[in-house]
Amino acid sequence: EDNRSVADFLLKSCKDYNEGAYYYDLDFAISDAYLELASKGALYAPHEHSNCIYSATLLINYQEGHSPLKFRRNVAGSYYPVMQFPNKDYTAFNMTEATVPMKEGDLIIYPSSMTHGYEGNPYDDRVSMTVNFIPDK
């Protein structure tokens, strides 16, 4: 029962995110989920998730000072703009790297193809769950 309610929460959250982002004409399923326990000094090298549309990280035990997720725009790809000009200010559309403010209990959903990770964790017991979403049959 508890597992079903967690899955329902995650699927509804993914649906809501999709409607505010790419708005794909899809229903979603969870392909996999895993827990991560990070001790002091742990890091998660920048990476992407393949064969899924969206990924999410649920912060289960996240104290102030634990390492936040950092997202990076892939600037080595052929689709990165050829022409660039100085920016007046940074926005979500022109930054090459961003750290999202987060707190315990937050669910952060992002495109699976977006590079993400975190740098050296300064404290023990950073617990998170990562979930990957795929199209439902």
Regions found by a protein language model. Name each.
Residues 29, 63-65, 125:
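Short loop/turn segments at connectors of secondary-structure elements within structured domains
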Residues 90-137:
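Catalytic core of Fe(II)/2-oxoglutarate
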Residues 28-36:
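A short glycine-rich, His/Asp/Glu-containing loop-to-beta-strand
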Residues 38-109:
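Catalytic core of non-heme Fe(II) oxygenases with the double-stranded beta-helix
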Residues 20-24, 42-46, 57-58, 116-119:
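Short helix-to-loop capping/linker segments positioned immediately adjacent to catalytic or ligand/cofactor-binding
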